[in-house]
């Protein structure tokens, strides 16, 4: 769905583990890494689109995750001119995104990049929370920064809990 301003409705998905690290995925056949994301279909809510994209891109189902947060508003980024398809109607100049922060409840073995037979990603890894802001393609950085800042109060306490848990397990002689 492309709105009257030329922005395509889209959902972005940040999956964190119990340590507060986030899933970082490499686009199939490319050297670029990003969070899972995808378009919102006509008549579909943002949450419905998120669950559909979650399965299509990383093979996870609703029972594998828990929604921790979603962005208060839609965030936009413009595509560089070289990526705008002028021959398509209506012309899409960028994306407007509703973001979801999910916590993986199941084993990471549930992640299946080939769940739908046409993978969007060919590799993934856990990275530190702020890592994606510096590493994502430049035209998405502002949105990533805003999303990560908004979700930080929810995610960063997970890192503190994990750190405290590890400390309690250490013994001094």
Curated annotation (Swiss-Prot):
The record ties this protein, via InterPro entries, to: Nudix_hydrolase, NUDIX_hydrolase-like_dom_sf, NUDIX_hydrolase_CS, NUDIX_hydrolase_dom, RppH
SUPFAM superfamilies documented for this protein? Nudix
Q: What class of enzyme is it?
A: hydrolase
> GO biological process annotations for this chain's record?
mRNA catabolic process
Q: Which residues form the Nudix hydrolase domain?
A: 6-149
Q: What GO molecular function annotations does the UniProt record carry, in alphabetical order? A: mRNA 5'-diphosphatase activity
Q: Where is this motif: Nudix box?
A: 38-59
Q: Mind listing the UniProt keywords for this protein, alphabetically?
A: Hydrolase
Any one GO CC term of the record = cytoplasm
- KW Repeat (keyword) present: no
Pfam families documented for this protein: NUDIX
Reported EC number(s) for this entry are 3.6.1.-
Please list the cofactors this protein needs.
Answer: a divalent metal cation
Q: What does this protein do?
A: Accelerates the degradation of transcripts by removing pyrophosphate from the 5'-end of triphosphorylated RNA, leading to a more labile monophosphorylated state that can stimulate subsequent ribonuclease cleavage.
Family, similarity comment: Belongs to the Nudix hydrolase family. RppH subfamily.
Name-wise, this protein is RNA pyrophosphohydrolase
Q: What organism does the UniProt record list as the source?
A: Shewanella piezotolerans (strain WP3 / JCM 13877)
Source species taxonomy: Bacteria, Pseudomonadati, Pseudomonadota, Gammaproteobacteria, Alteromonadales
The gene for this chain is rppH
